[in-house]
A protein has these predicted regions:
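Glycine-rich phosphate/pyrophosphate-binding loop and the adjoining helix
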Residues: 66-156
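Helix-loop-strand module that forms the ligand-binding subsite of alpha/beta enzymes
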Residues: 1-72, 138, 142-150
């Protein structure tokens, strides 16, 4: 979750996402992420929720997360106590609906074609000597050969 800050995530969220940059598919992805779901939530007094959620969703995609939910809400306030009850009720309803979907899909998410294509492209870079440390990780996992992180591992 991140409040909108100049149409993007806050500095602390950006630092968190950057800290895990080494887990991007190009480097050393955690195979359990290929079986998870993620939620991006952003709030703003005005606008910018879409681009803020995209910042977070991009990292989830490159971590291999197959299902990402996004929820942005204009709260028209700068503190929780100033949010109108009608908006709070809508948030409650929307997030309950999202939670239901997450529970329903738990253990059943599948890696999509876009992620698989991206993975194969990253694999091609590694087989051409992209980075020694990353290649050693991929090789240890068998991903430079026939194994794939979304197969035979529920990782939950």
């Amino acid at each position: 979750e991140s409040p909108v800050y100049v149409y993007h995530v806050t500095g602390s969220m950006k630092a968190f996402l950057d800290h895990y940059g080494y887990r991007w598919m190009l480097h050393r992805p955690e195979e359990s992420m290929f079986h998870k779901q993620a939620v991006c939530i952003s709030t703003a007094a005005g606008a910018g929720m879409k681009s803020t959620n995209k910042d977070m969703a991009d990292s989830f995609f490159y971590w291999g997360v197959p299902k990402v939910y996004k929820y942005g809400v204009r709260v028209m306030a700068t503190s929780y106590k100033d949010i109108k009850p009608k908006i709070k009720a809508k948030i409650e309803k929307d997030t309950n609906k999202m939670a239901y979907q997450i529970k329903k899909n738990a253990g059943h998410v599948k890696t999509g074609i876009k992620t698989k294509i991206c993975f194969y492209f990253m694999r091609m870079l590694h087989t051409r000597g992209w980075d020694e440390a990353d290649l050693a990780y991929w090789s240890k996992k068998g991903w430079d050969r026939e194994k794939r992180p979304w197969k035979n591992n529920k990782g939950v």
